[in-house]
């Protein structure tokens, strides 16, 4: 193969393998609208996966009486992400700046990079997706990188990275098949769904503020 053709193929392969193109002299600046579109696609995918998996798990394993007692008990329904200061209603959310909402979203994403491993068997056995833990982890990492890129663009025009948030969820015994293990998995799925919903909502608000014509969908 000619040297020129080989170089072209390598360049094309590199571009396809990078979901978030690094901004520098080698590449033109990626439009902000495209960066938001990429982030929103991943956020929506994660939220939909979390919602469907939670619903499927609930219908298959959690009796109604257990569901109600779980949701009404602050100790079992409290998510670790509650320790991350987040707006609790629409008014508070609108008062946050774009960078604040992106930072909150980044912390929420990073808080799941380790705990999501405890749900590997749940994702693998899901009839809705049958996805693997690594697929979910890759989506989280891609979205983490995308949010960091957006923060850099909105702040000073450059990409940025941040400290990974250290998870402190209690260890979940996914190897056990007793009711306690089921409720622990149910609790994790409940929190995962809740946090992915927040992330998609916050990103949608920032996109609406930042990209003309992106509101209302």
Swiss-Prot record:
The gene is GH1. The modification Phosphoserine is found at residue 132. One of its GO terms (cellular component) is extracellular space. SUPFAM superfamilies: 4-helical cytokines. It comes from Macaca mulatta. Transmembrane segments: none annotated. Its main location: secreted. InterPro entries: 4_helix_cytokine-like_core (IPR009079), Somatotropin (IPR034975), Somatotropin/Prolactin (IPR001400), Somatotropin_CS (IPR018116). GO terms for molecular function: growth factor activity; growth hormone receptor binding; hormone activity; metal ion binding. Plays an important role in growth control. Its major role in stimulating body growth is to stimulate the liver and other tissues to secrete IGF1. It stimulates both the differentiation and proliferation of myoblasts. It also stimulates amino acid uptake and protein synthesis in muscle and other tissues. This is Somatotropin. GO terms for biological process: animal organ development; growth hormone receptor signaling pathway; positive regulation of receptor signaling pathway via JAK-STAT; response to nutrient levels. Zn(2+) binds at residues 44, 200. Residues 1-26 form the signal peptide. Pfam families: Hormone_1.
